[in-house]
């Protein structure tokens, strides 16, 4: 009695190329959704000038762009971080943002203590978790698909 095992790997390059292409498309879509999601939520949460009824320059300066598997979301106005974290003794330092937010804390030349109006970092935090979960799902989906 005996058993033989033989592997035919002739189809392996085609299958791995196909998997790579599928995974690339899935992950690119995840990057697009995450970047757009952060941008939309940040715009919705950005402080608004109640006198004019819209977000003004800060709101309009929030952008996102995606190239391949890289997404970038930003705030184009230099005062954006001051709005997000506050200034002086009113700075709020959220977990995970210590290195960046601490630059706005402390006594400066002027006694300007601006209360934070978080809009950007909460959006990043929400969508970062979603992004990680969606990437895991995409990888699992592509890897378990029958070929």
Region annotations inferred by a language model:
Residues 1-80, 92-147:
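Short, Lys/Arg-rich flexible segments
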Residues 88-90:
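Short intrinsically disordered coil segments
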